[in-house]
A protein has these predicted regions:
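Rossmann-like dinucleotide-binding cores of NAD(P)H-dependent redox enzymes
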Residues: 6, 10-41, 45, 126-173, ...
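Feature captures the FAD/FMN-dependent oxidoreductase FAD-binding
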Residues: 32-82, 172-180, 185-187, 210-212, ...
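Mid-to-C-terminal Rossmann-like scaffold of FAD/NAD(P)H-dependent oxidoreductases
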Residues: 160-162, 170-173, 187-188, 281-349
Length: 367
């Protein structure tokens, strides 16, 4: 029942779902439909306004806003800190994806492209480069293929599209028309921490016209947002309520956790909404009934239950034909109505119980 306003610095709402994920992974029409639902609910979008630059939180407080949710993501790019990184042909993968998502131009770039990184974002950058005019795309990662942070499905799709993998290599320097790599002997040290070691005597040089860096993301803070932050730039907040050191400011998504999945940010949004609802009603506890550790759930993993679960291989949607493998369109089909019913029927009998802390009275029936 609260009036809600979203301030967005870009010309379109949607954040990283719109500007950070290419259409062949997530169709823009899907996000646009969801945003139309939000508008129909009465949510106001103020676009092209950067909080901290065009308007401050104090300005908004003076206008009557009582609680704030900061979900600005991790839209910066980490640096390699190697010679030649300031070369004109070097660009961050995040900036490149933002450019691609704005225009989807098949002639955006030219020549051979090198993508540095091994995560899902690096795969997106490589596949987007292939669709944007690149002749060849080389994806270079520290990890061996089986150890890459990217999901195996994403890696397989990239290989099927012709992207060339160079696994076990770390960048040494960037030249005018090429990038030099040194062999990565190990990615982690004996304690399991990220601490790559190299053999500088084994080098590989790749000729290229563009170098796209996708080795991680960083936080670009809001000017004047005087909240406590962690050494890595993420905002500190209470784990259950997502309340920051400034009592009327709540936080969620990548700016709180560092780069994670979109569903994690969505989950934070729901929890923060509950916190803000309680916050504006003075005297209400932000924490009562919300700590899941206080609920003692039956340990099903160590119980002998004589139930025959469905362990059949899951259904895989088909592929759209006739659009070309280098199309910006998502080629994955959706489930048929019959398939949806089959999957939903499985959900009804999975045996898992989820505690809704807003409704649970501790009766124990779910166990």
């Amino acid at each position: 029942g609260y009036p809600v306003t979203i301030f967005e610095k870009e010309e379109k709402p949607g954040g990283m779902l719109v500007y950070g994920i290419p259409s062949f992974r997530l169709e823009k029409s899907v996000i646009e439909a969801e945003i139309e639902v939000l508008k129909a609910m009465g949510i106001e979008f103020k676009l092209g306004i950067e909080v901290g630059k065009d308007i401050t939180l104090d300005d908004l407080r003076n206008e009557g806003y009582e609680a704030f949710y900061v979900a600005i993501g991790a839209q910066g790019s980490r640096k390699l800190n190697i010679p030649g990184e300031d070369n004109a042909m070097v660009e961050s993968g995040i900036d490149f994806l933002r450019k691609v998502n704005k225009v989807e131009d098949p002639n955006l770039i030219f020549g051979d492209v090198v993508v540095v990184g091994g995560g899902n974002v690096a795969i997106d950058v490589a596949r987007a480069a292939l669709r944007s005019g690149a002749q060849k795309v080389h994806l270079c990662s520290l990890e061996q293929e089986g150890e890459m942070p990217a999901s195996p499905e994403e890696v397989l799709e990239a290989k099927e599209e012709g992207i060339l993998l160079h696994c076990g290599w770390g960048p040494k320097e960037i030249l005018e028309d090429s990038i030099v790599f040194k062999q990565c002997v190990s990615v982690k040290d004996e304690t399991g921490r990220f601490n790559p070691s190299y053999d500088d005597s084994v080098l590989e040089t790749i000729q290229c016209s563009h170098v796209l860096l996708s080795i991680g993301q960083s936080i670009i803070p809001i000017q004047g947002l005087d909240v406590d932050v962690n050494p890595n730039g993420t905002i500190k907040a209470e784990g259950t309520t997502l309340q920051t050191s400034v009592e009327d400011v709540f936080v969620g998504g990548d700016v709180y956790t560092g780069p994670k999945f979109a569903i994690d940010a969505i989950s934070h949004g729901k929890e923060a909404a509950e916190s803000m609802h309680r916050f504006v009603h003075k005297g209400h506890s932000l924490t009562i009934g919300r700590d899941l550790h206080l609920f003692n759930e039956f340990d099903k993993n160590n119980a002998l239950i004589d139930i025959d679960f469905d362990h059949a291989k899951r259904q895989i949607p088909g592929i759209k034909k006739g659009l070309g493998e280098k199309s910006f369109t998502d080629l994955r089909s959706t489930f048929t109505e019959e398939q949806v019913k089959i999957e939903a029927n499985r959900c009804l009998g999975c045996g898992a119980s989820i505690v809704d802390t807003n409704k649970c009275i501790g009766c124990g029936l779910c166990t």
